[in-house]
Amino acid sequence: MKNNKMKKIVLSILLLTVASSYSQELNVPVATQYLADNPYVISPTYAGIGDNFRINLNGYKQWVGVEDSPQSQALYADFRVLNQSGVGLTLYNDSNGNTRQGGGKVTFAHHIILDYYTEQYLSFGLSYIYNTFRLDTSNFDPANPDSDITDDRSTTNNNFEVGFLYRNKKFYASATATNILQKDFSLEIAYEPNKLTNYQFYTGYVLDIKNRSELEPSVFYQYYQSDGRSVTDLNIKYRKFNRYEDYFWVGASYRFLNDQIGKPLAVGPIVGFLKGYISVGYSYQVTLNDLAAYNAGTHSLTIGFRFLQGLSNCPCTQSPVHD
């Protein structure tokens, strides 16, 4: 009995340590959702690039087996407007222990040609963000009340996201800043961060190999201004096409804190396919930090739908996959 109680106490401390800033990001957390052929997850600049109106539904569950562990559900949609612009929409719901957040983004992106013959393109993206954040105290232990928190707290945040994307043939690199406006509200909690801006950098290269196949190494970097954390994903993805332009992909992702490169947070496979107008992507991550002994890993599932195919007259918005 004492061992079980002590185990719960240790687990609670670990959760508070690892996840204390997670719920303060005021944005849907980014894990491996973007690797399911959905880079719009991490940058507004990808809105409108492609030949279809796209809708992607994602479910994400972190640290399976841990009670009240982080989870989120999100809808991502984007489509092209005329030949060189795009619009997008994100709706999400996220929970982590006693915190809840939800909201959405509305995006506009514009794409220009830097050099037609060398296939160099530049994209700009802007999103308006609306977020609600709530702290639920109904599950707090009344025998050990927190002197700073005696009732439910909630707040809303209106903010913006900006991004830039450069493409040169099969190379791409994007930079994005999320929640660029500093916070003008307070939940009156001592450890609440005053700075909300998150920075993301994403780059990769698509290598054409034999037998209608592609190999795509990529790097995704995130920096959280609230507490100075930064994490990096190292990814590799193999894509195989058939004669009908359907394809499947397999790969792997390796995530680590940048001050602990040799101690990964998580590592795991990614798989998926596109068949006609439907795509499915799945990723599994094995937790390798102090929570490893208490959970069965992290799962992410994305189901995508593509509608209203219309080829663009501008190469800067044509599909980046298998040009």
Task: Give names to the regions the model predicted.
Residues 9-18:
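Sec-dependent N-terminal signal peptides
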Residues 24-323:
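Subset of outer-membrane beta-barrel
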Residues 19-23:
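Sec/Tat signal peptide C-region and signal peptidase I cleavage site
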Residues 1-9, 114-116:
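Positively charged n-region of N-terminal signal peptides that target proteins for export
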